[in-house]
């Protein structure tokens, strides 16, 4: 047997560039019979290594490289598992090292785990004799071929391997530079570390003692460990009075079924079936464990989602409180979740509110023990973009070049360097000079290697034994992790549950809590009506900002066209709006509005597809069709569905024949059977799990219900979740204003870090103010809670410590209106800053001394700042306007002129704006033009004025005025902009509109009687303007008569209407 006993794979992170598949490929090509994986301190690569070896008839040997110490000296040591007990010892030894961040292993620690291991000390010198002597009674202790001779110790040839060929030695230097954040030495030739995979020819050229090579075979023969997959490692649930889990589960289920007062016989029949499947597969403990942790969450103020994935199709899950979706009511299939004909672990993923998810994990750790619960490792890899920058950095590329590299590699998921090389600009960069070609060569060698570890976002492993008995552990940022990935840990047989954090659940929970506290209303989301017409009106208008699953522009558009009328419409939309099924949306909407257009290939499809108007949307429908036509069990139907989605031609052909034969035996003609099979094959690729759609649609409905009935609380919490994003905050503020919600400035006595809903509106968060950080807000709020509300500005200044009370902070708070409630103008308070800063005697904590020793502080009253300046400061400090901006205020007053906002204006429509910025530039031809920033009081937009227009309006732009602009909308650098063709002052535009209007449209006739004498039945001369009435209730326009524009009462007539009720066209 030829064996390599010291392979370091790429999972020896940033120490080896040898991928497992390359090591095995080289072993096959060199007729190597056995390989030992010996990464330093870790066992990350064991499962992949084992699978690759077995697939290629290579004997896998499990080992690890460690550094053993006696406190004075350290010796590199390779330990190999002789058997499965030794493998478990490796798990525990690696876990001890990683959990305790050990760089070296004491000889005592190694001795604890050495009974079932082979120990090979490397490069042993005289200074290491004491360490080796400790293991003199250990029969399987060796020294490598480079060690000194010690009586009684055998030597073995052992070659360290961490890259493929001599030409790959540069990868080790590059990885070391990346790891240590140093530069790569490109001047001198790269050192050959002598750690490449030796060929048989190279080994024969070495002068190796034959006895040393013989010992290689001896050791390889002794090692006989293997990974065991699909073990039964489910933890046992502790039941009351040591009752069996099966009996206890049944007792709990029947008790709950009776309590819910459902149609007992129907539900009992389904329950018996599910219970039998679950217990026959041995999963009763699993369901009790999941039920227990969800019960803990619900009874400890942690909101849990209604369900996730296919688990909502289980009645057992519903009765145990794991889900809140009744599978019989919603026609959900248990077999989509758990299939007796496809034995796999059940997979229940759980959504918790993201801010309290850790509470549940902590509960599980406390219940089962710290070493019994862990997260799961994931690996970050040196993918194309990452490796390109990393290698560029260590080669000394400047920031400009690194940015150029980033710009040349497309932002495409999974892109490779080979794909990037097909792009001409990238190829030119590579061949620009020899240095770039060297860079590309190193990048290619390192591409795809694992770079670092991180924590899987949701997966938690639970066992009633210490986990290191089954898998090695390491330490993550927040607790223990398995050293193996999610799929690897599950394949071993370990129980994995996904604890997912869902932001929307946190929002719902916070709204419910605030409504109960402020309004005394206890909303039970399980009892809200799911046929609320106000909710469906909201959805039909596409007013879904902030609504889970429904807030994208595309979904809004679908909702407006569909006009949902019941909950099933929401379920359908969330399922259809994805790549693939989107093409069926027009068909679904058309048939939904006109069911007479629904056609079925066969009448027996109608009961299955009636609720979706003949369109196959859900995976469960595919299973139902297979069951109805081909007499498949639901288990067989689920296997068919999976086969269809995988597109395996051989399997598909087999399943096609199976389906057609089944349908023929069931009395269906072969032609219709083939058509039905092709129909479900078309949809199998993107059919959506209905159980998941129903669960997530329930969250969407709940959020819609809260938005309709408690809008202040809804928007306050949505806003609190976008703190830090100026753009999203501004969008949400504008949306709330459109809904008629009053946005109140930050209030020093009401506001805190999050937005605060109230009966009057929403108080802005102090945290949104630029320059005011979280710690400052915490100090202010804590002081207010402990010692009561602030009496005035001076009281605030006295009670807040110096380290927080800076001029910058005080100015920011004043200018956004945080002290407005004290009744002093912002300009007055700005004037008072010097008093509180200059007169500060650092005796804030003693109010009595303050009053005695400090001169009485007095306000010097000043007139309020101009509206425009207030708006300017609010925009500067908040990113949006709280007070009504002068432009917006003028827009409200002048909207009768038929003017537009930037957000809803179309090409060449008049828009009321002010110019925030005018940047004049000179073109290559020496002509002047300008880039401008337009402000309509709500939002800003970039604009451009080309030379011809600029020459025409240059003098006008020098005035600080309000303007009406029009032009064509365009995109520049993927940003919307306006190419301005015409500019007028508002006064000029109004004058022309009044003089030359073609039509007057009114929406309110209450003022008409006062001007009855002005209105003529027919047009008598050119100055007569048609007067029309638009009835919004019936969406109809009628002509009332004509009014003469030259009439002395014309302006009075116009001004007598509310600006929102009249338009001049």
Curated annotation (Swiss-Prot):
Gene Ontology biological-process entries: DNA replication
Subunit structure: DNA polymerase III contains a core (composed of alpha, epsilon and theta chains) that associates with a tau subunit. This core dimerizes to form the PolIII' complex. PolIII' associates with the gamma complex (composed of gamma, delta, delta', psi and chi chains) and with the beta chain to form the complete DNA polymerase III complex.
Record carries keyword Transferase: yes
Substrates-to-products reaction catalysed: DNA(n) + a 2'-deoxyribonucleoside 5'-triphosphate = DNA(n+1) + diphosphate
Main location: cytoplasm
Organism of provenance: Staphylococcus aureus (strain MSSA476)
InterPro entries: DNA_pol3_alpha_NTPase_dom (IPR011708), DNA_pol3_alpha_thumb_dom (IPR041931), DNA_pol3_finger (IPR040982), DnaE2/DnaE/PolC (IPR004805), DNAPol_HHH (IPR029460), NA-bd_OB_tRNA (IPR004365), PHP_dom (IPR004013), Pol/His_phosphatase_N (IPR003141)
GO CC, any one term: cytoplasm
Recorded GO MF terms: 3'-5' exonuclease activity; DNA-directed DNA polymerase activity; nucleic acid binding
Localization, UniProt: Cytoplasm
Keywords attached to this entry: Cytoplasm, DNA replication, DNA-directed DNA polymerase, Nucleotidyltransferase, Transferase
Domain of life where this protein originates: Bacteria
Keyword hit for Cell division: no
Free-text function comment from the UniProt entry: DNA polymerase III is a complex, multichain enzyme responsible for most of the replicative synthesis in bacteria. This DNA polymerase also exhibits 3' to 5' exonuclease activity. The alpha chain is the DNA polymerase.
Protein name per UniProt: DNA polymerase III subunit alpha
Family to which the UniProt record says this protein belongs: Belongs to the DNA polymerase type-C family. DnaE subfamily.
Enzyme superclass (EC): transferase
Pfam families the record matches: DNA_pol3_alpha, DNA_pol3_finger, HHH_6, PHP, tRNA_anti-codon
SMART domains, alphabetized: POLIIIAc
EC number: 2.7.7.7
SUPFAM superfamilies: PHP domain-like
CDD domains named among the record's database cross-references: DnaE_OBF, PHP_PolIIIA
């Amino acid at each position: 047997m030829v064996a390599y006993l010291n392979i370091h794979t790429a999972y020896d992170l940033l120490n080896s560039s040898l991928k497992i598949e390359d090591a095995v490929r080289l072993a096959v090509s060199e007729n190597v019979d056995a390989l030992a994986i010996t990464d330093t301190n870790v066992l990350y690569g064991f499962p992949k290594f084992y699978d690759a070896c077995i697939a290629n008839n290579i004997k896998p040997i499990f080992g690890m490289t460690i550094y053993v110490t006696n406190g004075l000296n350290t010796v590199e040591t390779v330990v190999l598992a002789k058997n499965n007990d030794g493998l478990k010892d490796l798990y525990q030894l690696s876990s001890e090292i990683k959990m305790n961040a050990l760089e070296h292993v004491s000889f005592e620690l190694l001795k604890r785990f050495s009974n079932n291991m082979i120990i090979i000390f490397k490069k042993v010198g005289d200074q290491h004799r004491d360490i080796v002597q400790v293991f003199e009674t250990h029969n399987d202790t060796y020294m490598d071929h480079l060690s000194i001779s010690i009586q009684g110790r055998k030597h073995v040839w052992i070659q360290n391997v961490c890259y493929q060929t001599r030409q790959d030695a540069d990868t080790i230097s590059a990885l070391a530079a990346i790891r240590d954040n140093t530069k790569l030495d490109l001047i001198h030739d790269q050192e050959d570390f002598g750690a490449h995979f030796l060929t048989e020819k190279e080994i024969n050229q070495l002068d190796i003692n034959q006895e040393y090579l013989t010992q290689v075979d001896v050791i390889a023969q002794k090692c006989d460990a293997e990974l065991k997959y699909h073990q039964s490692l489910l933890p046992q649930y502790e039941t009351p009075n040591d009752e069996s889990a099966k009996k206890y589960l049944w007792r709990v289920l029947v008790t709950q079924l009776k309590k819910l007062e459902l149609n007992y016989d129907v539900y009992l029949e389904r329950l018996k079936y599910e219970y039998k499947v679950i217990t026959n597969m041995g999963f009763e403990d699993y369901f009790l464990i999941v039920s227990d942790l969800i019960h803990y969450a619900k009874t400890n103020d942690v909101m849990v989602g209604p369900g996730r994935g296919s688990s909502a199709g289980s009645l057992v899950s519903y009765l145990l409180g794991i889900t809140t979706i009744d599978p019989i009511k919603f026609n959900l299939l248990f077999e989509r979740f758990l299939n007796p004909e496809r034995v796999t672990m059940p997979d229940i993923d759980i959504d918790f509110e993201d801010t309290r998810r850790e509470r549940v994990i902590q509960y599980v750790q406390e219940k089962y023990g710290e070493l019994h619960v862990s997260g799961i490792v994931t690996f970050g890899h040196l993918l194309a973009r990452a490796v390109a920058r990393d290698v560029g950095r260590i080669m000394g590329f400047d920031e400009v070049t690194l940015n150029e590299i980033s710009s040349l590699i497309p932002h495409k998921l999974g892109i490779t360097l080979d794909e990037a090389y097909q792009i001409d600009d990238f190829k030119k960069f590579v061949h620009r000079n020899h240095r770039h070609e060297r860079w590309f060569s190193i990048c290619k060698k390192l591409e795809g290697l694992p770079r670092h570890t991180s924590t899987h976002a949701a997966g938690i492993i639970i066992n009633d034994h210490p986990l290191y008995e089954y898998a090695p552990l390491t330490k993550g940022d927040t607790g223990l992790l398995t050293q193996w990935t999610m799929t690897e840990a599950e394949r071993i047989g370990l129980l994995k549950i996904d604890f997912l954090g869902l932001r929307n659940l946190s929002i719902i929970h916070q709204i419910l809590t605030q409504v109960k506290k402020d309004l005394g209303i206890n909303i039970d989301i399980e009892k809200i009506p799911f046929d609320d017409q106000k909710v469906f009106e909201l959805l039909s208008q596409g007013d879904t900002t902030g609504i889970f699953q429904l807030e994208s522009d595309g979904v809004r558009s679908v909702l407006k066209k569909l006009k949902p009328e019941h909950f099933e419409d929401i379920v359908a939309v969330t399922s259809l709006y994805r790549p693939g099924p989107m093409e069926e949306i027009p068909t679904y909407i058309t048939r939904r509005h006109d069911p007479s257009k629904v056609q079925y290939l066969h009448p027996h499809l109608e009961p299955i597809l009636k609720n979706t108007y003949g369109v196959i949307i859900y995976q469960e429908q595919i299973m139902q069709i297979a069951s109805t036509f081909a007499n498949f069990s639901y288990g067989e139907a689920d296997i068919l569905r999976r086969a269809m989605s995988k597109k395996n031609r051989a399997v598909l052909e087999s399943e096609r024949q199976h389906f057609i034969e089944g349908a023929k035996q069931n009395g269906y003609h072969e032609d219709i059977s083939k058509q039905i099979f092709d129909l479900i094959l078309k949809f199998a690729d993107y059919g959506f799990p209905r159980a998941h759609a129903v669960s997530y649609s329930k969250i969407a409905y709940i959020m819609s219900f809260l938005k309709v009935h408690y809008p202040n609380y809804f928007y306050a919490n949505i806003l609190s979740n976008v703190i830090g994003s100026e753009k999203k905050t501004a969008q949400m503020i504008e949306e709330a204003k459109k809904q008629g919600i009053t946005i109140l400035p930050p209030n020093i006595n009401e506001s805190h870090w999050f937005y605060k809903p109230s009966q009057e509106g929403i108080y802005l968060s102090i945290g949104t103010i630029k320059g005011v950080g979280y710690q400052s807000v915490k100090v202010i709020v804590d002081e207010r809670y402990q010692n009561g509300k602030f009496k005035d500005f001076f009281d605030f200044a006295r009670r807040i410590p110096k380290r927080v009370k800076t001029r910058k902070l005080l100015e920011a708070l004043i200018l956004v209106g945080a002290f407005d409630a004290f009744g002093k103008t912002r300009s007055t308070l700005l004037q008072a800053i010097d008093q509180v800063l200059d007169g500060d005697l650092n005796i804030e904590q003693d109010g009595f001394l303050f009053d005695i020793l400090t001169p009485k502080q007095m306000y010097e009253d000043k007139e309020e700042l101009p509206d425009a300046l207030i708006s300017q400061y609010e925009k500067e400090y908040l990113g949006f306007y709280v007070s009504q901006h002068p432009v917006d205020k003028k827009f409200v007053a002048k909207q009768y002129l038929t003017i537009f906002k930037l957000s809803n204006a179309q090409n060449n429509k008049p828009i009321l704006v002010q110019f925030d910025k005018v940047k004049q530039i000179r073109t290559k031809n020496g002509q002047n033009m300008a880039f401008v920033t337009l402000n309509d009081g709500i939002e800003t937009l970039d604009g451009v004025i080309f030379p011809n227009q600029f020459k025409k309006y240059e003098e006008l732009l020098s005035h600080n005025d309000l303007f009406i602009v029009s032009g064509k909308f365009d995109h520049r650098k993927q940003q919307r902009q306006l190419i301005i063709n015409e500019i007028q002052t508002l006064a000029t535009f109004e004058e022309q509109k009044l003089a030359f209007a073609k039509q007057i449209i009114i929406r309110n006739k209450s003022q008409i009687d006062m001007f009855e004498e002005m209105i003529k039945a027919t047009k008598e001369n050119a100055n007569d303007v048609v007067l029309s009435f638009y009835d919004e209730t019936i969406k109809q326009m009628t002509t009332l008569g004509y009014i003469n524009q030259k009439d002395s009462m014309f302006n009075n007539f116009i001004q007598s209407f509310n600006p929102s009720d009249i338009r001049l066209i």
